[in-house]
Amino acid sequence: MRRAPIVYLIFMVLAAITAQGQHLVLVHPTVEYQDGSQPLATAEPRFSWNYQADVRDVRQTSYRIIVASTEEKARDNVGDLWDSQTTPSDRMLLIPYQGKALGSRDQAYWKVITTVTYRPDADVTSATGVLDTTIESKINYFEISLLGSDDWYAQWIGFNYDDDSLVQKTRIAARYLRKEFLLRDEIREARLYISGLGQYSAFLNGTEVAPQEIFKPALSDYHKRVYFNAYDVTRLLQKGDNAIGVILAGGRFMAMRYNASEGDWCGLNHTRHFGAPRLILQLEVTYQDGTTERIVSNESWQITNLGPIRTANEFDGETYDGRMDLGDWTTAGYTDYRWQRASSAYPPEGPLTAQPNPNICIQDTLKPIALFRKGDRWILDMGQNMVGYLEMSALGLREGDTVTLRFAETLNPDSSLFLDNLRSAEVTDRIIRGATNVHSKTERYKDAVTTWHPTFVYHGFRYVEITGLRTEPKPHHFRGLVFYDQMATTGRFETSDEILNAVHRNAYWGIRGNYRSMPTDCPQRDERMGWTGDRTTGNYGESYLFGNQRLYAKWLTDIEDSQWANGALSDVCPNYWRRYTDNMTWPGAFITVADMLHTRYGDEQAIRAHYPAMKRWMMHMKRHYLVDGILNRDCYGDWCMPPESLELVHAQDPARITRAAVISTPFYCYLSDKMAQFADLLSLPDDAAFFRNEIQVVTQAYNERYLDKKTGRYDNNTVTANLLPLAFGMVPKKMEEKVLANIIDKTENEFGGHVSTGVIGIQQLMRTLTEHGRGDLALKIATNDTYPSWGYMVRNGATTIWELWNGNTADPSMNSGNHVMLLGDLILWDYEYLGGIRALEPGYRRILLKPHPFAGLESVNCAYESVSGLIESSWSCKDGLFEWDFTIPANTTADVWIPTANGHEVKTYGSGQHHITSKIGTWRFWK
């Protein structure tokens, strides 16, 4: 959408103060943590900003938010929509709008004026006086999307074709829809509101709308809600004749695996099916004289499925037949006499909902590192297991030639593609060369270039097998286009240890590759689902790497949309598979993600919105499964525990298996503690007391049942059995040392200082060891490069994170090369314990800086771009001398734990850049 022109007061250029080389700038003004480029899905927006400064001890003392109906009024400080007046406050995150009621299509201009104090002197201990100044932001713009069903005048349209194949691996041709229309006058502005199910690409007068965005709109349970997008298309329209065109593909609206005779859509052979592709579109044009006109989807539109995209199944790939190219079908004057009239289509059950999160965008490009021939085919190596698609330029193809691209994460020993771990996914793209309008069909074909990439599918791959070429390809003929949900990279982490660095890099690639308008488990095989348990703890670490708040806030809606009337939640959200297993661990992400959004971004809204559904789920689990203080309900166990034999997927040895109640009962206490905190936040004292009483009663029953008070062992003494109650505060204080000793003994002596847990245990292992004084063991686990460890993956060529610790030897039936669930709390530990960056207050208004300089690690360079500003922590330790540079954002403070020879010293620091040197001798790890 459009933004207001950048306007500054003459005496406040860049909203900064500048004196003797010092400056203080108000930056990142956002509404709902958005920059105004996307219409808002709410009429109750919240305003945020932060600062950049090279002065110290910056404190905001007041703010004034002005919201106006025009840019001129905002410039003149006339807040005809809302003027907060000068408000004494240091608040700068998510301040709610409290002005005149806003509604669909409303546009507003806003700015903020703040007063701040700061200390200009570079010496933090100096007595130099505190100065104050006023800072004014640039004028910003926001717009409200369509919020109600009565805003829509369009109808759903489509067409059911007899040649659609809806058996098992569904095959349908893309739908092409078009409409020509006349605009009678010059245009002031125009908005396009559109939803195409399952996926769409839209064009106006031959130009694609938002070409950088793909896989639109965001995924959802279409029985609960259907997202639509909104665009400013003013520049794409003209007075006179115009044309609009839309391509539709099945996406997730049409099941990738389907059998109409099966009622249960659970598993690899049957995903959820909602129907054939359909479109709703509303183009609203405002003329220069202020009058308006709407162009809407209805039965006057033309449609065909005889275009070049013949199939587009997310699991199996896309086939593009250039011989069926439709020419300039998105421009006015096109002859469409062979097309059909579109039919009215049944609306999806879910209401149209303004999409709250950005779409997926291309955000990186890779060049191949190798290209070699194998028989009659070519093998391309991208050098990185990536998620996206391949763009190809081929020379000399003739009409009817077929180029086939197959994708894989790894190679067999003979350099052929290893495809066994893809299950039924065909992951094959095909392009058939059409007639050329550049050269005649003679010898000059060899000079013709065919450039192509798919539109509606993606792949998880490092290697590509290419067949059907007539000329020898070159590496520069190919590009890997990397895409994921649009978001900023917010974390930076580097150490003196190559394994830690490589694993962090692999995590970065794996996490972003599994953002597909939901956090997925994997990007390559016939699954690609939003498994909740993969993110129960992982979401906390991911949110250091990426500004993913809008993706995760949207995913919480997906989770609540999966809820049954009895309170049960699906393990997969959106619930394209029917996975209602009633266990505490996987759906627990519903609660932990909301906690993360509050902690990391200062956002209470997710807790307020979803608390009733969270409570229904907790009550459902208590009502059906909590007996005598024990909740004996778990489906997956300590998933992917390192097995005793390298060819196994799951451990068979009873000594490695943690029983259900020993997992689910501690998790019930853990989540009850989160719920009690939420109840405190929401001023629900009865709920808070209830959940805290649950913890007390269940903890007592659990310890009586499973804790051996002589040995300090829980149940069968697996690391996870002992770890969970210790991590969740359930172990009696006098028993903590014994329980910890059992964890250490198992990890060091039976596992040789390697990973000793599965998915559930690894979510708590690194932090718990460190909190109890054995961070040295955590570091050993993190830096090992032999099995089982993250470093073992690196040493065996992984460039992402495997699904299994033994991913290079295990049965390929469940052996993804790009899963993030095994990361557990590693990334969280990297930033919060090695880097030492933690939030003491939501949104990092107060910060804890507490790095852990373990022996064997010489340096850590860590940074996090929080919503309150940039936090940096970079330290080195050599010959007993600890040197530390850290940055505290403006308008925040930090409790700083300084390592000393005898332990630590704690000081409170204001904002700015600081340097500390401390002699710590040989003492190198601490709590």
Feature roles, as predicted:
Residues 199, 296-305, 463, 472-506, ...:
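Active-site acid/base region of carbohydrate-active enzymes
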Residues 190, 194, 204, 389-409, ...:
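Alpha-helical support elements that line or immediately flank enzyme active sites
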Residues 1-7:
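Bacterial N-terminal signal peptides that target proteins for export
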Residues 19-21:
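Boundary at the C-terminal end of the N-terminal hydrophobic targeting segment
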Residues 24-107, 111-525, 533-534, 550-551, ...:
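Extracellular/oxidizing-compartment recognition motifs
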